[in-house]
A protein has these predicted regions:
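N-terminal beta-strand motif that seeds the catalytic metal site of vicinal oxygen chelate
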Residues: 1-19, 69-72, 129-132
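Conserved short beta-strand elements that form part of the metal-binding/catalytic scaffold
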Residues: 31-77, 94-95, 104, 125-130
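Amphipathic alpha-helical segments
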Residues: 19-31
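Vicinal oxygen chelate
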Residues: 1-3, 74, 83-132
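Short amphipathic alpha-helices within nucleic acid-binding modules
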Residues: 23, 79-85
Length: 132
């Protein structure tokens, strides 16, 4: 069977699961599906639902925040609304040199559409994209 027959879930390392829970469940309002151990840390991982399915696995690790690339992207219909809601919840959107962002951090996406980036407390970068 090809891998395309199976769901894919992003996994993100964090340095402090309690701080991550505050961010992912409180600030981003992602519903937790389950929690469990991570390596030798009881309760050191969470799986969150997004888009109607298990989509994001967050786990405590010493490698947290080491990626400088976007680790996961949400594809949204109304980028302005989602950015405004997350900003109201305390999310700061990133601005990158060489790109023209509006005041909220939204910029044109290569190939069309628009995109905005933000980071979790460990510096893991996420994107929001829309075609409009």
């Amino acid at each position: 069977m090809p891998l395309s027959d199976f769901p894919l879930r992003a996994s993100v390392a964090v340095s402090d699961i309690d701080r991550a829970v505050t961010f992912y469940e409180g600030t981003l309002r992602l519903p937790v599906v389950r929690s469990g151990p991570s390596a030798r840390i009881a309760g050191g991982s969470r799986v969150y639902r997004s888009g109607g399915d298990e989509a994001l696995h967050v786990y405590q690790s010493t490698t947290a925040g080491s990626s400088q690339a976007t680790v996961a992207t949400w594809y949204v219909e109304d980028l302005d609304q989602v950015v405004d809601e997350l900003t109201a919840n305390g999310v700061d959107f990133l601005h990158y040199d060489g790109l023209t962002h509006d005041a909220r951090g939204i910029t044109a996406r290569a190939g069309g559409g628009r995109i905005a980036w933000f980071a979790d407390p460990d510096g893991n970068t996420f994107a929001l994209e829309s075609d409009g």
